[in-house]
Amino acid sequence: MRKQLFWILPSIIIITGIFLMFNQSITDVTEQPEANWSRGLEIGTTTVDKTFPVQETPGGNFIIQTYEQDKLRAQIFNHEFKQINEKTYDIPLDKWTRVFLNHDQLIYHDYNDIYDQDGDVIVSNAKRFYPLGSTILYIKENNLYELNPDDLSSTKIVELNKGMEDIIPFQGKKQLYFMTEQSLNNDVKLNIYELTDNGAKRVYSTSFQIDAMQTVEDTDFAVRDSNLAFMLETVQKQSQGSPESYTYVAKTSIGSNREPSLKPLTFPDPAGEGSLSEPNDITISYQNETLQLLFSANGFTETTYQENQAFNVYTATITDNGEIQSARKSNTAKGTVDPKRLNNSTVMWLEQGSERNNILISSSNPAVIDKASTLSQDDWLRALGKTFGMLAKVLITILATTIWFIWPVVFVVLMYVVKGRKLDEDISWFFYTGIVIYMLATFIFHDIIFIDGMFARAPDYLTFTGSSYIYTLFFALIAFIATQSTKATHDWHAPARIIYFAGAHILMLVAYFGPYYF
């Protein structure tokens, strides 16, 4: 055992460092989006990358539609998101198909005609189709209609302005609203209508001026009692490079005569520094009397190896004093699109894949938090990949430590030049002088290796006050014990022991600090 001590001692330290590195990788890739909020829980897959309707039943169950080639799958989950039932419908489906499903009644639109479940045409040449909770809206020939799912009869609601081909519906607690939007140059006109028994009544109208270099990309609105809020997403016109997007919000009330003003929004990154970038798929709603946005954006995450940036799901709450409070609702290295709110405590989104897209949810429900905490095969693979990437950094960091290693090497070479073969004798002062020179180099050039960025990235057990000096001295003690064992068991002379001491010390240090050097 004593003969092997020279490699066993540093090997134990290095292997422990690699294990801690892997454990940190596991911690990073499985970090919850925020406190008391679950990681993503996969509940299904779909072949399309567009909106998928979700219904919450009076009993608290969820009916989620997933699409496959020529097949609609309706899955029923309980409040813990355990699947309790499933039903499939054989209808032609692609990413353009929109489906209304209420109980066992199915009506769908193929971007041209509206069909019943048997494939019979109900309405031909329908431009748009809006499946809602218990009714359907559609646009045909510049007119907005309501389709009664019970008797399949159509009622004209309102004639739309020429060239208007889309509306934004909103299902309130008691009423159904829809918004029309028209943009001319930098003038944006919005009209809010309430659906009535006699058609539609315009309840609010306003217009906004946006920057002349911007165009409207998306709009949304929300109504709660008499409170009304608008969201505009615009894109900066640019001749080169990626377009830059902007988000605006305006708040008012139905019946108000005061013109609302657009407020530009910047979303702070709740997990990192700075702001979230490229927010998209933005929806607006009132949650517990407070205005809140749900969206996907590029923000900080430690689930990735190098970039520490990925698209995740976020919410932004706008307080009464105008402050914006962001919260992260997913934490994954994979791209997230089309976030959707199921209720106050649960969100859902698509995670893009090469052939199929995964459907995931996250929630503050304790049962979901517990269920989502289980490590998956993907978690292990991502943690291993991140660990191997960190080990590659260790190899590069070793190059930076040559500023330490070169000094004992130069000392040994110079002493051989001066003393020659006499150094092969056991000269204690030569060995200890070489060790002292190396240790002086580690302290003199301390800041070249132990840089500020390293401490910002490293875990807590490496960043306490004086940690770099404590680890340096502790590993020096281990290296010294291992080095001294070679004197009696392997008859190593001073030059070999000096070089071994420096090499073992460097390997132990970089096994712990190297992954966070850059």
Describe the role of every protein-language-model region.
Residues 2-518:
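Extracellular, repeat-based ectodomains that mediate carbohydrate processing or recognition
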